[in-house]
């Protein structure tokens, strides 16, 4: 028997869990609440889910000493029968209840599964990893919208969010397992702590080349200069982290010497935004986020994107042009990986934000310094070495998949558009 005060309720005789299920209809919760109100029970917990018009609701109540569990069961069942609903009842032992109360201080994490479409093998793979790591799933929510049966293979993207309780046996092994299964199943799986900052982040910093746009600008300029293959090979090695970024950038830049500056506009005209970029940034702006481009590319292209997308800040390299000709140099310091991290810190300070309130998104090894210090660092369609080092990665859906990592549903975001 549970005795004494419990959350301000009367002396308690028993704790009762009531489970109501059946076809959803208006008035079910009210009908059950009306019965319970006559017995002066205290509501300790309540929750419900509706899947394809099937309701499953749970109410945990403390029954006072003068109350009767059998009478409550009888009257609740009677009202449910009139609604063509069913009910189950469980008297919760004192020890079990106290254990439940004690769980409230335990760590909680969010596991987000993203894919073009989600099948049972994806759920099996993800939930096996969480179970093996001793994590208990408290809640599962579909964040993506409803889809028709026809054409599910061609739909945009799907997302399911798991709220899990506890700490993994090995955080490193968990992340490694999730990264491995993501590659095997062509899905993305994010794992992050469920903190107050998750939906209160306010600054998003993007890399530009191969992140917001689908190309490396310096490679495109090199094609115009007739040194495309040579520059592309250096770019690939730099993005994989095999060559120091500043060294590789200087080498590639020198090969552009003599290029007519009019070519910059030609290249800009053929650049394309990566999937989901415009939708993501519009949504972020509507939600009040500050956005910035911090790029090892060039200001000419960054400022063009700023105009198209409405980005708040742009930091990139200033290509030196003399008499309409590219000199093969930049003016000022080169924005390398460390400078990216420094600029992220400066932006956060200007906005009065902690680093926990900052999101960083990039694809290359030179993005890792800023990705690693941001509260939410995301490798987008990145090289394997970058994905392995970043806490989160997205490779199989568009940039707008980031909204799911922030906890927003399609229903939430569609209201903004």
Model-predicted segments: where are they?
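A conserved regulatory-domain signal marking ACT and ACT-like small-molecule sensing domains
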Residues: 2, 6-201
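Conserved active-site and cofactor/substrate-binding residues in soluble primary-metabolism enzymes
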Residues: 23, 27, 54, 67, ...
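Short glycine/serine/threonine-rich phosphate/pyrophosphate-binding segments
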Residues: 28, 122-124, 212-215, 367-370
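Solvent-exposed alpha-helical segments within well-ordered globular domains of core cellular machineries
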Residues: 30, 34, 44, 74, ...
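Long, charged amphipathic helices and adjacent flexible linkers at domain junctions
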Residues: 95-104, 191-202, 235-264, 325, ...
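Active-site neighborhood of HAD-like aspartate-dependent phosphohydrolases
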Residues: 196-246
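C-terminal cap/substrate-recognition subdomain and adjoining C-terminal extension
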Residues: 258-376, 380-417
């Amino acid at each position: 028997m549970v005795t004494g005060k419990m959350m301000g309720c009367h002396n308690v005789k028993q704790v009762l869990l009531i489970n109501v299920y059946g076809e959803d209809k208006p008035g079910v919760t009210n009908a059950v609440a009306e019965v319970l109100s006559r017995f002066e029970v205290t509501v300790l917990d309540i929750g419900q889910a509706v899947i394809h018009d099937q309701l499953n609701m749970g109410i945990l109540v403390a029954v006072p000493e003068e109350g009767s569990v059998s009478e409550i069961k009888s009257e609740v069942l009677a009202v449910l029968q009139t609604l063509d609903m069913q009910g189950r009842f469980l008297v919760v032992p004192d020890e079990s209840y106290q254990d439940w109360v004690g769980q409230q201080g335990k760590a909680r994490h969010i596991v987000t599964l993203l894919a073009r479409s989600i099948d049972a093998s994806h759920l099996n793979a993800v939930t096996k990893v969480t179970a093996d790591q001793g994590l208990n799933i408290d809640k599962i929510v579909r964040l993506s919208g409803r889809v028709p049966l026809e054409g599910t293979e061609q739909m945009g993207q799907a997302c399911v969010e798991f709220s899990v309780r506890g700490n993994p046996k090995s955080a490193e092994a968990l992340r490694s397992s999730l990264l491995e299964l993501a590659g095997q199943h062509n899905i993305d799986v994010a794992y992050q702590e469920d903190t107050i900052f998750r939906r209160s982040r306010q600054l998003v910093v993007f890399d530009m080349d191969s992140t917001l746009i689908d190309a490396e600008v310096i490679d495109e300029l090199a094609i115009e200069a007739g040194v495309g293959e040579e520059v592309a090979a250096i770019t690939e090695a730099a993005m994989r982290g095999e060559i120091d970024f500043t060294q590789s950038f200087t080498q590639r830049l020198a090969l552009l010497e003599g290029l007519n500056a009019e070519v910059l506009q030609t290249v800009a005209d053929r650049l394309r935004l990566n999937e989901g970029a415009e939708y993501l940034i519009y949504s972020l702006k509507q939600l009040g986020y500050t956005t910035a481009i911090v790029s090892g590319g060039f200001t000419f292209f960054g400022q063009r994107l700023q105009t198209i997308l409405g980005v708040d800040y742009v930091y990139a390299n200033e290509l030196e042009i003399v008499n309409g000709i590219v000199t093969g140099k930049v003016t000022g310091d080169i924005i390398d990986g460390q400078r990216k991290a420094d600029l992220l810190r400066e932006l956060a300070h200007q906005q009065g934000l902690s680093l926990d309130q900052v999101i960083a998104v990039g694809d290359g090894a030179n993005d890792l310094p800023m990705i690693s210090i941001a509260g939410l660092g995301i490798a987008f369609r990145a090289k394997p070495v970058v994905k392995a080092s970043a806490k989160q990665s997205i490779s199989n859906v568009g940039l707008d998949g980031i909204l799911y990592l922030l906890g927003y549903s399609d229903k939430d975001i569609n209201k903004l558009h």
